[in-house]
Amino acid sequence: MNFGQLKAYLLELIGRAPSDLCYALVTADINAALRIAAMEDTATLTEAASVTLPTDFLAMVSVYRDTATRTPLRPTTAQAINNVHRTSGTPTQYAIVDGAMLLNPEPDGTEDIVIRYYAKQADLSADSDTTAVLTKHPAIYVYGALAHHAQLIRNMEAAAIWQSQYIQAVKGARASDSVDRYSGAPMEPSVRVAP
C-alpha cells in the first residue's frame, strides 16, 4: 500500500479525508515505539573514535568490525567508556551519544564497521510514498490515522475504538515479526562468559 491508496481507503471508509497531521502523528508513534524486522536497515561505516550514524538511525540491532574474523562490538554507556577510555587499540565496545557511535578503545586503523539498525519510517507526502511498515502492516497506519483523526475532531468514543484497533495491529505486527525472525522455532539460550 502507498500513501495515495491509504488516503483513498480512509476517504471511502469515513467519508472525509483526515488531516495530513494524522499521518505525521502515526509515523511519529511508529518511530517512537515500534521495533520490527521490517524497520531494519544496514550501513557500512569507517571506524574512528566517533562515527556519525545514519540520519534515519533509531536504535542499534547489531554491530561488528568487518575483518577476516567478524568482531562484534558490545554496547555500553558513554560514562562506562569514559571510565575505561583507551586512546588506541582494537575497539571492543561502543556507546551511542548524540547521533554518533563512540568506540573504545579508539581504533588504530580504519576497518569497516557494519551496523544493523532500526531505521525511522519517513513521513509520507507524495501519493507514491510508502514505508516498510505501511507496506507490510498497513493496518497500523489505517487504525492509527483513524484514531488521531477521531481525537482531532473530538469524537472520543470513535478515538477509543480506533486506538484499540491500532494497539491490536501493533501487537499483530510484533507477533508476526517474532514468527518471521525465528521461523517458528523456539529460541535457544546463548551462554556468555563475563570478561
PLM regions with names:
Residues 1-195:
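Glycine-enriched, solvent-exposed interface loops adjoining structured elements
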